[in-house]
């Protein structure tokens, strides 16, 4: 018996790809408005995410801007919008890179905005940081440069580990990274979590070399 195999021509209708333009999220920020682009870059390493943001012609989110974004996502009147829900999902599933470089020394921690996404690729020098802080302002012992981009929190002004929302908002390390207003916003944000937040850093012993780290929040 001869069996014939019939060839059937099947056609698959492929829909045209839908290109969704980026959505702009606007949140209150330091008396004005900050704008963020959705969808976000990543997931990827700190440097890769920063590079992608900069190549897109955008600015990387430093601590104060990140605090404003989170306040919008958790506390804002538009927090039920899909884009803000996505921010909360990222906080649960991964983390958000915060483009600040932190240099830990025995006496405390320096924080400087990482607007070029250098991360740990280039060292920071204590003398250079001190020069940046000259002529700046002081808030409860935490020093800020005139432009607000560099800060120093002395040991004793911060505690690494578990916090209450209230203690987080007053923590020197948090204030150095996110600013006074940003730290207050983070305190309000974490009060919605149902669990106490934790901060992580480096304890550098006397006589040891400084330790350079970057920031993230989750």
PLM feature spans:
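A binding-site-centric feature that preferentially detects glycan-recognition modules on secreted/surface proteins
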Residues: 1-59, 65-218
């Amino acid at each position: 018996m001869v069996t014939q195999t019939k060839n059937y021509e099947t056609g698959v209708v492929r829909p045209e790809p839908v290109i969704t333009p980026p959505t702009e999220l606007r949140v209150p920020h330091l008396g004005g408005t900050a704008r963020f682009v959705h969808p976000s870059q990543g997931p990827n390493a700190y440097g890769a995410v920063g590079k992608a943001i900069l190549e897109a012609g955008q600015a990387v989110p430093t601590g104060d801007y990140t605090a404003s974004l989170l306040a919008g996502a958790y506390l804002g009147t538009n927090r039920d919008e899909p884009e803000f829900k996505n921010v909360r999902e990222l906080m649960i599933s991964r983390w958000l890179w915060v483009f600040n470089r932190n240099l830990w020394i025995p006496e405390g921690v320096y924080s400087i905005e990482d607007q070029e996404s250098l991360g740990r690729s280039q060292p920071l020098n204590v003398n250079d940081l001190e020069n940046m802080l000259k002529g700046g302002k002081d808030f409860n012992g935490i020093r800020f440069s005139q432009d607000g981009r560099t800060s120093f929190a002395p040991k004793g002004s911060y505690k690494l580990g578990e916090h209450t929302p209230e203690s987080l908002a007053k923590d020197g390390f948090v204030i150095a990274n996110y600013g006074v207003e940003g730290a207050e916003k983070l305190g309000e944000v974490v009060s919605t979590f149902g669990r106490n937040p934790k901060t992580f850093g480096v304890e550098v012993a006397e006589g040891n070399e400084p330790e350079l780290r970057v920031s993230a929040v989750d």
